[in-house]
C-alpha cells in the first residue's frame, strides 16, 4: 500500500506479436490466435513493418477478422521516418477500429503528434523512448496523446513514473507502462495495479 491505498485486483494485458518474426499475414494471424488462446485480452501488431500501405491495410484487416471486433487491436507504427505514412494509413484502417495508434511519428515531434491526433481521430500513444518529466508535460500541454507509455527504466523509476501518472490523470490521459526487460516488467506491473488511469 505504499503506492496506492486502493490497488486494483486485476489488470488487462495485451500481447505484442513482434511482427518482424512473422513473415506473412497468415503466420502473424496464427501467432495472434495462439496468443489469444493463452489468455491475452488484446493484440499489438506492426502493420508497416516490411509492408506497403496497401499491404498494411490487408494485414490489419486479416488480424481483425481473426480476433473479432471485441478484442482490442493495437497498431504500432514504430516511428516511421516518413511522417506522411501515419496520415495515409489512418483512413485505410479506421474501419477496423484500432484500439490505439502507437508512435505514428517520433515521440520528440510533439506538434506532429498533436496534428496526427486531430486529423485521424485515432487514440495516439507515445512516450516509450522519452525519459524526462518536462517532455511528458509538454506532450500533455499540447494534447498530443491519448495514452502515454513511458518506460519505467527510462523515466527514472517508480517516483518519476508516478509523477507522470498523476500529471496524466489531471488531463484525462491514460497510462500504459512500456517495458524493455524483466525488471521493468515487474516494476511496471506494480504501477499498473496502483494507478487509477
Each predicted region: which residue ranges?
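Flexible, active-site-adjacent loop/turn segments at secondary-structure boundaries
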Residues: 1, 5, 103, 156
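N-terminal capping/lid subdomain adjacent to the active-site entrance of alpha/beta enzymes
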Residues: 1-73, 78-80, 87, 91-95, ...
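Active-site beta-loop-alpha junctions enriched in small/polar residues
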Residues: 16-20, 46-50, 72, 76-82, ...
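Residues at alpha-helix caps and immediate loop-helix transition turns in enzyme cores, especially N-
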Residues: 27, 55-59, 85-86, 112, ...
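Shared catalytic-loop signature of beta/alpha-barrel
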Residues: 91, 97, 108-125, 130-197
Amino acid at each position: 500500500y505504499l503506492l496506492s491505498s486502493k490497488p486494483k485486483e486485476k489488470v488487462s494485458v495485451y500481447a505484442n506479436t513482434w511482427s518482424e518474426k512473422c513473415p506473412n499475414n497468415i503466420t502473424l494471424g496464427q501467432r495472434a490466435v495462439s496468443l489469444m488462446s493463452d489468455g491475452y485480452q488484446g493484440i499489438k501488431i506492426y502493420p508497416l513493418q516490411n509492408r506497403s500501405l496497401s499491404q498494411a491495410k490487408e494485414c490489419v484487416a486479416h488480424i481483425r477478422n481473426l480476433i473479432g471486433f471485441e478484442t482490442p487491436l493495437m497498431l504500432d507504427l514504430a516511428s516511421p521516418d516518413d511522417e506522411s505514412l501515419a496520415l495515409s494509413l489512418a483512413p485505410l484502417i479506421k474501419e477496423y477500429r484500432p484500439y490505439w495508434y502507437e508512435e505514428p511519428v517520433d515521440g520528440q515531434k510533439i506538434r506532429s503528434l498533436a496534428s496526427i491526433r486531430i486529423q485521424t481521430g485515432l487514440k495516439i500513444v507515445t512516450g516509450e523512448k522519452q525519459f524526462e518529466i518536462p517532455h511528458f508535460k509538454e506532450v500533455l500541454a499540447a494534447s498530443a496523446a491519448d495514452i502515454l507509455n513511458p518506460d519505467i527504466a527510462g523515466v527514472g523509476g517508480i517516483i518519476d513514473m508516478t509523477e507522470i501518472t498523476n500529471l496524466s490523470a489531471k488531463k484525462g490521459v491514460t497510462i500504459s507502462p512500456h517495458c524493455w526487460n524483466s525488471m521493468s516488467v515487474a516494476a511496471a506491473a506494480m504501477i499498473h495495479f496502483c494507478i487509477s488511469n
